[in-house]
Regions:
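Membrane-embedded beta-strands of outer-membrane beta-barrel proteins
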Residues: 37, 73, 92, 133-135, ...
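Bacterial Sec-dependent N-terminal signal peptides
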Residues: 1-22, 196-200
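Short glycine/proline- and aromatic-enriched beta-strand/turn motifs that initiate or cap beta-hairpins
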Residues: 19-73, 197-199
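Extracellular/periplasm-exposed beta-strand and loop segments of Gram-negative cell-envelope proteins
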Residues: 26, 53-71, 101-129, 158-170, ...
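Outer-membrane beta-barrel "beta-signal"
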Residues: 72-77, 186-200
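Mid-chain, structured segments of secreted extracytoplasmic proteins
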Residues: 64-108
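Short loop/turn motifs that connect adjacent beta-strands in outer-membrane beta-barrel proteins
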Residues: 46, 80-89, 140-148
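Transmembrane beta-barrel strands of outer-membrane/channel proteins
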Residues: 25-29, 41, 51-55, 92-100, ...
Length: 200
């Protein structure tokens, strides 16, 4: 392959890549000062891959830190396309995610659940993994480069974490059994919002 042919194929590939790529920002999470941004690459007419991340950076919520980061890999399927515009609409997609957190459970939970986090300033810090499904719908706007995307996702969240008091000392569920990590698993809705998307 000569240099001219290689350069032509290189430019053609990246032209197609960028023509089928969307960047996104979650308008709903932005309202609560939690940035959530993503990028979606069209793999074929009905399939796409999305990578998105979100984070919070609050040092003091009810006397405790509230810091989280999440990243999700998602494979999307668009079962139906609008015939006139070949416009993607409803989608469903399995996802796998990873997160880190340092936070306190809300007071309304600690008042009804038996937990070591009742003391002011106490918090938990750890890692979690997500396995689930996302459902959503793209809503076209007048400007063809922009769309709105309504979505919600949930599944299972598996966590490994430690409890700490406000001085930063470890709290154990059972002082006689000092585990390296506490573990928990829940089935819940853990992502969603309204994305503003832009086609590059």
């Amino acid at each position: 392959m000569n240099k001219k042919t290689f350069n032509f194929l290189f430019v053609l590939f990246f032209t197609q890549f960028y023509a089928q790529t969307e960047i996104k920002i979650n308008l709903a999470s932005a309202l609560i000062l939690t940035p959530n941004i993503g990028i979606e690459v069209q793999l074929s007419e009905k399939f796409g891959y999305q990578l998105d991340t979100s984070a919070t950076f609050f040092d003091n919520v009810e006397g405790s830190p509230f810091q989280t980061t999440q990243i999700f890999n998602e494979f999307r399927f668009y079962p139906k396309l609008k015939k006139t515009k070949n416009q993607r609409s409803f989608f469903i997609g399995p996802h796998v995610g990873y997160g880190m957190f340092t936070l306190r459970l809300p007071k309304f939970i600690t008042t009804i659940v038996d937990t070591e986090l009742k003391d002011e300033g106490s918090y938990q810090s750890g890692r979690n993994a997500y396995y689930g499904i996302t459902l959503g719908k793209k809503i076209p706007l007048k400007n063809k480069n922009f769309n709105l995307e309504l979505f919600i996702g949930g599944g299972t969240s598996q966590s490994n974490y430690k409890y700490y008091n406000k001085e930063g000392n470890r709290i154990y569920e059972n002082p006689d059994v000092k585990k390296k990590f506490n573990q928990s698993g829940e089935e819940l809705i853990y992502r969603g919002g309204l994305m503003l998307t832009y086609k590059i």
